[in-house]
Amino acid sequence: MEILSLLSYSVFYLALFFIFNIVIRARKFKNLPPGPPSLPIIGNLHHLKRPLHRTFKGLSEKYGHVFSLWFGSRLVVVVSSASEFQQCFTKNDVVLANRPRFLSGKYIFYNYTTLGSTSYGEHWRNLRRITALDVLSNHRINSFSGIRRDETQRLITRLADDSSTNFAEMELSSRLYDMTFNNIMRMISGKRYYGEDCDTSDLQEASQFRDMVSELLQLSGANNKTDFMPLLRFLDFENLEKRLKDISGKTDAFLRGLIEEHRTKKERANTMIDHLLNLQDSQPEYYTDQIIKGLALAMLLAGTDSSAVTLEWSMSNLLNHPEVLKKVKDELDTHVGQDRLVDESDLPKLTYLKNVINETLRLYTPAPLLLPHSTSDECNIGGYKVPQDTIVLINAWAIHRDPELWTEATTFKPERFEKKGELEKLIAFGMGRRACPGEGLAIRAISMTLALLIQCFDWKLINGDKIDLAERDGFTLTKLVPLKAMCKSRPVINKVFKQ
């Protein structure tokens, strides 16, 4: 009997606590965007079915283009329309310039001090200046054109060796990832760690690097419930915090080793690390080792995965739409021909190729929810009150498929970008102060690779079967089934590579 009484009192007080919590929350947060009812402690975490961008699109159809959720104890507002997106990054741009603090940012991103993880302020402005002037300026991007040319030609050579004059089945996914990682790492440090022809001077270092990057990509986008329910941090059932600490130590040791290796060289080369070390000699307070490590890490994580998946989605859609593939090939044959390889100087003339890439970015936005923002003050979005310290997510995937914004919104149709004003609606790289600074580099690298793949080879489906466009769950929108296709060398291969 006493046990039953105790249980009854416990249930009563627990219910009273939950009701009290709901009343306090309702009084504190008035005129919030609408959203589904939340549960005590977990909030709306039970609503978060994967993939999130599709779940959020479904919720926006029920609750409106601006809706709110509770991720445990943290308020989240999701924006799914172009007009509210514009409001966020024009009127509210400064208020939304902060980043939420997640556990991965503490360990992987040097205690929230890297360009993508730090909040708005003097440190961010310094990082943005360094990135714009010393890392991703047009001059610096142009200086790495030889690396991009060499890496894409290595890819073409390997494909040509395997295909020759007859159609042969090719697995493209891993080749595109290898090329993209080598491209970025050569820009950062002059080293190649991927593929059969990677630098053989230290195979163990290359293997350790590949393992490290694989874990970094997994953990940096990990769904960590302790970010939203702090009590779980003490339990850490998934051992996530320990894994974050371990990979943080490995990454820091690797980057420190790279910097020391370049610092002790007699002559500086054309790499990002060497260039920043030269600046460190004259301005050590601005170009510290930690800033150099953070910039290298940001380049590695932001500049690889997204470019590789965009190439894979582009080729997948071209194979599924042979009439579009033919138009790109005809454009290349008209402006470049088969007597020489396409060069970066040709890209401005290849307008249809550019439309294909833009259409791929629209339908298959590499980061469907972009990077999360955090409000530094109370603001208004879509007529609703958004309190300070709210996480704001932009469902770019939903905006890019909004039938009110795009005709035939779910159809792969590159011609849409021939119409004036369409390009301005594309938000794959964000907008405002926190827009991705690497857009220019990414578009140039993607354009060159895609152009060479189409100029140098004929492509077709395996047995006529359409490419499976199913998505894999994750922060980056990757294909569930790795891309395979049939390819055959075109005349330019013999004229350029086999003379």
From Swiss-Prot:
Transmembrane segments: none annotated. It is an enzyme of class 1 (oxidoreductase). Pfam families: p450 (PF00067). GO terms for molecular function: heme binding; iron ion binding; isoflavone 2'-hydroxylase activity. Its main location: membrane. One of its GO terms (cellular component) is membrane. Induction: By fungal elicitor. Its cofactor is heme. The keyword Metal-binding applies. It comes from the Eukaryota. It is found in: Membrane. Involved in the biosynthesis of isoflavonoid-derived antimicrobial compounds of legumes. This is Isoflavone 2'-hydroxylase. It comes from Glycyrrhiza echinata (Licorice).
